[in-house]
């Protein structure tokens, strides 16, 4: 089992990265990406901390830790720049916080994310058929979330993903 979208105390999570990794390992996970929320103000700082702790934990633990980011609530036009910077700085997993139906995410975020160098579009809400096809073409994964609210469109996203991909 793996989880490629988790948060630590570096954003809105409750655990230090080491405790998050330990708990995941005990629960049977083989790999864990820590993808804390970032924007232009904290991307470099958060990612540097996650890269350091991931390197340290990978020396001593039997679970693979991947440093990453979740680009969150930024203007869609800024997503390509931030994704490129995150990749350049060493992010192994780049997530974009999609247009969830329960948060005021800016319209156009899904499309901008799918046009950028990202790995996962998280909780994409009422994603369009065109966007689903673009995700398939670019090899970008779409997240189905267990989180309350974000999960409201899981059935819709899964149905379209099956239809087109």
Predicted regions span which residues?
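Glycine-rich, proline-tolerant flexible connector loops at the mouths of alpha/beta enzymes
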Residues: 33-46
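Histidine-centered catalytic micro-motifs
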Residues: 1-11, 34-37, 124
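Conserved N-terminal beta1-alpha1 strand-loop-helix module at the mouth
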Residues: 12-28
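Short, conserved loop/helix-junction motifs that constitute active-site signature segments
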Residues: 135-136, 161-164
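Short acidic/histidine-rich active-site segments
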Residues: 37, 164-165
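Non-catalytic positions within long, well-ordered alpha-helices that form the structural scaffold/packing
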Residues: 25-28, 87, 114, 162
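Extended substrate/RNA-proximal surfaces in nucleic-acid metabolism proteins
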Residues: 43-149, 155
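Short, well-structured secondary-structure segments
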Residues: 31-34, 66
């Amino acid at each position: 089992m793996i989880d490629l979208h988790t948060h630590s105390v570096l954003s809105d999570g409750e655990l230090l990265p080491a405790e998050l990794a330990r708990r995941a390992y005990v629960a049977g996970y083989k790999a864990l990406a820590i993808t804390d929320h970032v924007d232009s103000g904290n991307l470099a700082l958060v990612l540097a901390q996650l890269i350091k702790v991931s390197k340290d934990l990978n020396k001593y633990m039997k679970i693979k830790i991947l440093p990453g980011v979740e680009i969150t609530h930024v203007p869609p036009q800024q997503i390509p720049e931030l994704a490129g910077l995150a990749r350049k700085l060493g992010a192994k997993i780049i997530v974009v916080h999609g247009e969830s139906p329960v948060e005021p995410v800016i319209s156009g975020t899904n499309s901008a994310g799918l046009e950028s160098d990202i790995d996962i579009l998280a909780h994409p809400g009422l994603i369009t058929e065109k966007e689903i096809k673009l995700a398939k073409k670019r090899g970008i994964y779409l997240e189905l979330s267990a989180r309350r609210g974000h999960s409201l469109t899981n059935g819709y996203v899964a149905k379209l993903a099956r239809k087109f991909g």
